[in-house]
Amino acid sequence: MKPTCKRVFLIVMDSVGIGEAPDAEKYNDKGADTLGHIAEHRGGLNMPNMAKLGLSNIREIEGIPKAEKPLAYYTKMQEASAGKDTMTGHWELMGLRIDTPFQVFPDGFPKELIDELEKQTGRKVIGNKPASGTAIIDELGPEHMETGALIVYTSADSVLQIAAHEEVIPLEELYRICKIARELTLDEKYMVGRVIARPFIGTPGNFQRTANRHDYALKPFGRTVMNELQDAGYDVIAIGKIADIYDNEGVTKTLRTKSNMDGMDKLVNTLQMNFTGLSFLNLVDFDALYGHRRDPKGYGDALEEFDARLPEVFERLKEDDLLIITADHGNDPVHHGTDHTREYVPLLVYSPSMNGGKQLPLRETFADVGATIAENFGVKMPKYGTSFLQELK
């Protein structure tokens, strides 16, 4: 069967939520509104290209006019899974439903986990708090070099990171320690998405992380639409942190990125490639640099920079291409705390072959995106999700 669209370009604007989800209160997120609050904070957002697609038609956002004739089909999606982290949102987009949320540790890891890690590795743990990776090695690197203690830290995502100097703890030993941590955190009460080895070199005041980082992720808990595409011989091009999020499952080519703008450069490159399948981009800066840091000005600037790159995408899209723009959760930079927020996410679906867009019904799960991609390529449909392919005219 010939696919309806030869290439699908899926962009996940990491953490760009569009207002509190119906169950936001359960997550301590009542009133969260990533896009709305950023726009309000700066007296409006200037995003003319997203405006043309129909962003403000989903719901009005200050500074972004409603399109009289939106180019895209538009709606918002509600997350069905339990959780509001990157892995849960992305796995659901590709047809899975996660009922046990990944754990985050804003106050560091529980004492019993740290005690067990110390016991099994024979090394003391220092740190045990959320931190920037470069800041914590500057702070604790000298003590680590003296004592051989493990620098353990986390972030706002579901990760346990272990930093060690390559001359103090050789790489193979660090990797062995991370495998122990991975085993310990498979326990449901800890359920950590990723364990990361973070080796570094240098001297106090001049430490540098090396390229010998290693991730011990969880494989998705079931087959995703990406697995089905790969097995059917289609291309699945993962741009940014997509390959890490799915532990390389269902990925045929990986393009790493340094920033949102680098991600857009790589996307433009894939638009010029001849392939049949999915190009899947995650733009992480919104979340990592601005959402968690509660920086609404920086977040707004990044949204406007992203919008300014969209004409390069539009002019390279072919008649039989499909562009899908969405998000994986919220991260309201005006909200309390530093964590993600439980929100609806926007959904904009565009192809040059469309004769204008209109409103789609509210989606009750992110998995509708995966189901639509699966139907387009004629591969096995995911267990969750309802395709909207036939609603696109």
Curated annotation (Swiss-Prot):
| Superkingdom of this protein's organism | Bacteria
Per the record, GO CC terms? cytosol
Q: What class of enzyme is it?
A: isomerase
- State the Gene Ontology terms under molecular function: magnesium ion binding; manganese ion binding; phosphopentomutase activity
Q: Which reaction does it catalyse?
A: 2-deoxy-alpha-D-ribose 1-phosphate = 2-deoxy-D-ribose 5-phosphate; alpha-D-ribose 1-phosphate = D-ribose 5-phosphate
The family assignment reads: Belongs to the phosphopentomutase family.
Q: What does this protein do?
A: Isomerase that catalyzes the conversion of deoxy-ribose 1-phosphate (dRib-1-P) and ribose 1-phosphate (Rib-1-P) to deoxy-ribose 5-phosphate (dRib-5-P) and ribose 5-phosphate (Rib-5-P), respectively.
Under which name does UniProt file this protein? Phosphopentomutase
